């Protein structure tokens, strides 16, 4: 069973097993959550999603997580373009 340990705006972070789950509460859980290994990474992704930031140091996994979390189509498209430009494009589940 997971336990909510942090919330900022519509994003909740839950402790789950040996990792963390970030959920955009404005989306269905199936389509609006992602898993991360540490709390620091979870908070960074939440802040980036809220501010709609894109960092050059983001990994493919981080970009895919932000794509799943965001409701903002313009931000989602920028993230997808970053994946394509970086040559790290893969199947995206949005």
Per-region residue spans from a language model:
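Generic N-terminal leader/processing signal
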Residues: 2, 7, 39-41, 55-58
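Amphipathic alpha-helical interaction segments
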Residues: 19, 28, 47-48
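Intrinsically disordered, low-complexity, compositionally biased regions/tails
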Residues: 21-23, 36, 59-60, 91-94
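A short, exposed loop/beta-hairpin motif centered on an aromatic-Gly-Thr core
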Residues: 25-44
